[in-house]
Amino acid sequence: MQPPPRKVKPAQEVKLRFLEQLSILQTRQQREADLLEDIRSYSKQRAAIEREYGQALQKLAGPFLKREGQRSGEADSRTVFGAWRCLLDATVAGGQTRLQASDRYRDLAGGTGRSAKEQVLRKGTESLQQAQAEVLQSVRELSRSRKLYGQRQRVWALAQEKAADVQARLNRSDHGIFHSRTSLQKLSTKLSAQSAQYSQQLRAARNEYLLNLVATNAHLAHYYQEELPALLKVLVSELSEYLRDPLTLLGHTELEAAEMILEHARHGGKATSQVNWEQDVKLFLQGPGVFSPTPPQQFQPAGADQVCGLEWGAGGMAGESGLEKEVQRWTSRAARDYKIQHHGHRVLQRLEQRRQQAPGREAPGVEQRLQEVRENIRRAQVSQVKGAARLALLQEAGLDVQRWLKPAMTQAQDEVEQERRLSEARLSQRDLSPTAEDAELSDFDECEEAGELFEEPAPPALATRPLPCPAHVVFGYQAGREDELTITEGEWLEVIEEGDADEWVKARNQHGEAGFVPERYLNFPDLSLPESCHGIDNPSGGEPTAFLARALYSYTGQSEEELSFPEGALIRLLPRAQDGVDDGFWRGEFGGHVGVFPSLLVEELLGPPGPPELSDPEQMLPSPSPPSFSPPAPTCALDGSTAPALPSDKVLDCPGPLDMMVPRLRPMRPPPPPPAKAPDPGHPDPLT
C-alpha cells in the first residue's frame, strides 16, 4: 500500500505564497523605477542634443527602443510601458523638429526622480507585510486548534476502543484467571466514564477548530478581495501620477514641435491619457497566478469523526462548548466594530480638513495621525469580517443569532448618532471653545488606550512536552532511511527534538544512536493521562517518581553485580524497597542486564505519576492493536459561499511575526506505515 502524499504545513505554504507576492511586486516596482529613471535620463540627453538634427535624434531614440524591446513589458497602449513606446516612435519620426523643445526637456529632466517612487514602495510594502502577518497569525491559530482537535479525537477513539473491548469480554464472561467479573465491571464503568469525558473534550476542540476555520477563511477572503487590491491601488495610482505628467509633457511637446509627425504625436498623447491604475492592475493580475485567491478550504474530519458542523451539548442546551457565549461575544464585537468604523470615518474627515489648513511644520503629525486612524478602521473591518463568518456558522448550527445581534446593533447605532450630535455641538461652538476639534479627535485615542480593540480570544493551550523527554516503544520499526532509527518493542528512548514532518520525532536510544522514529509508535508516560486521573494512580499525592535515568558519565562495573553503561545511556530504574536505606547505589536495567550502579553518575528523568511498585497488576489489561492505516477521511464543506482557506496541519514552528526572508525549506517525510502487531501486555497503555 502506497503512503499518502506528503503534506506541506499551511503556514509554510501561506508564507511562501506571500513571499512570492512580495517578490513579484518588488520586481514590478523595480521595473517601474527603472522606467522612471529611463525617462529622466532620456530627458537630460534629449535636452543636450536637441539642437542637433534628425540623425542625432534618431540615434538617441534607437537605444531606448532597443532597451524597451528587451524589457518584458506589456504591449497594451493602456499601460505606461505601451505609452512610453508610442512616444519613442513619435520621437524617431519627428527627430528634426525638436530644436525648440530643448528648454522644456531640461526642466523635465530636473523634475523627475525616483526618490518619491521609492518612498511609495516602502510605505506600501510595510502595509502589505503587516496585512500578511495578520493572515499568517490566523492560519497559525487554525493549525493549533486543529492539532488539539486531532489529539482529543485520538484519545477519545482509544478510550472507545478499550471500553468496547472490556464490555465484550464482560458479555462473554471472559475474565480470565487474573480478573473477576466484578473487576471487569468496575473497569468497564471506569472506561465508560473516561470515554464520556473525552467525548466532551472532543466536542469542545471540534467547535473551536470550526470557528477558527471559518474565521481564517473570512480573513483570507478579505485579504484577497479588499486589502490586496487596496494596497495595489495605492502603489500603482501614485506611480501613475509620477509617470503620467512627464509622459503627457513629452506628448504635448511632440504635438507643438512637429507638424510633420502630428498624427504620431497625437497618438502618443492619447495613449498616455489612457493610462490608469485600474487597467494597469487588471492586466498585471492577469499575468502571474500568485495574486489569484486560493481555493476554498474544506473541513477535514480527524480519524473516524464524521461530524462536520457545530455541535450543541446534551439536553438541547449549550454545554461546555459555550456556543451561546460565543454568540454573545461576537455580536458584541460586531457592534463595537461598527462603532469604530463610523467614528473613524468621521475622524478622517476632520483630519483631512486639518491637513489642508495646517502649516508645514504640523503636516507630518497630521499625516501620521491619518495613517493611524486608517489602520484602526482597517483592523475593525477585518475583525468584522471574521466575526460575521463566525456568527453565520453559529446561526447555521441552529442558534438564534438575531436575538443578540439586533439589540447590540441598535444600541451601537444609537450611540453613534449620539456621538455625531455631540460632535456637531462641539464644532458649532468652535469660536467659544477652541479645543472642541481636539476633543473630537481624541475620542478615538480613548478607545485605543482602553486596550480592548481587536482582542482575539486566546487559543486553548496545547498539551506540550518538554524536550528531552523519555518515551516507551509500543511497536517496533525498521529504519527505511539513513536519518531514521531502528527501534524494538519494549525499549526506552529519549526524545530530543520534534521531527522534520508530521508524525515523526527525533529520538536517541540507550546506545547513543539518534534518528527519526514514528511518533505514533511511542508512548509518552508524562502526557498519557489527564489531570483528572492523577489522583487515581497516585493516591499519595506526592511528586512524580523517576523511573528512567540518563548516564552523565560512562561507568564500568567492578563486579558481576554492578552494571556497566556508556555516557548518555538510558537506564530503566527498578523498584526499590519503600523502607530501604539509600546507600548511594541504585538498581537498574540496561541492554538486557540488571545490576547496581552509583547514583551520582546518572540524572533522573521524571516518569508517570506514582512509583512503579504501586502499580496494580489487576488493572493491566492487554491493549488491542491500533486500527490499520487508512486513506485520509473525506472532507465536508462548511459553506459553499465562504471565503477560501488553507489546509489545516500541525502547529507551526515559528510563532513570531512574518519573516520576509526566504525560509529554509525542511525535507518532508511521508507518514510512517501502520504498526505490525499489538503492544506487549507487559507494557499496557496508560488509559487502561
Curated annotation (Swiss-Prot):
One Pfam family per UniProt: SH3_9
Known tissue expression: Detected in inner ear vestibula and in the cuticular plate of cochlear hair cells (at protein level). Ubiquitous. Detected in testis, liver, brain cortex, cerebellum, spiral ganglion and tongue, and at lower levels in the organ of Corti and utricle in the inner ear.
Domain SH3 span(s) in chain numbering: 466-527, 544-607
Residues with the Phosphoserine modification: S442
Stretches assigned to the F-BAR domain: 12-280
Subunit structure: Homodimer. Interacts (via F-BAR domain) with SNX9 (via SH3 domain). Interacts (via F-BAR domain) with SNX18 and SNX33. Interacts (via SH3 domain 1) with WASL. Interacts (via SH3 domain 2) with ITSN1.
A GO CC term assigned to this protein in UniProt: protein-containing complex
Start and end residues of each stretch annotated as Disordered: 607-688
SUPFAM superfamilies: BAR/IMD domain-like, SH3-domain
InterPro entries: AH/BAR_dom_sf, F_BAR, FCH_dom, FCHSD_SH3_1, SH3-like_dom_sf, SH3_domain
Protein name: F-BAR and double SH3 domains protein 1
Compartment annotation: Cytoplasm; Perikaryon; Cell projection; Cytoplasmic vesicle
Keyword tags: Cell projection, Coiled coil, Cytoplasm, Cytoplasmic vesicle, Lipid-binding, Phosphoprotein, Repeat, SH3 domain
Any coiled-coil regions, as ranges: 360-386
One Gene Ontology molecular-function label: lipid binding
Biased composition (Pro residues): 623-634, 668-678
Source superkingdom: Eukaryota
Gene3D superfamilies for this protein: Arfaptin homology (AH) domain/BAR domain, SH3 Domains
Domain free text: The F-BAR domain has an atypical, flat shape and binds preferentially to flat membranes. Upon heterologous expression, the isolated F-BAR domain is localized at the cell membrane, and causes the formation of cellular protrusions.
UniProt KW Cell division keyword: no
Task performed by this protein: Promotes actin polymerization mediated by SNX9 and WASL.
GO biological process: apoptotic process; gene expression; import into nucleus; inflammatory response; membrane organization; positive regulation of actin filament polymerization; response to hydrogen peroxide; response to peptide
Source species of the chain: Mus musculus
Main location: cytoplasm
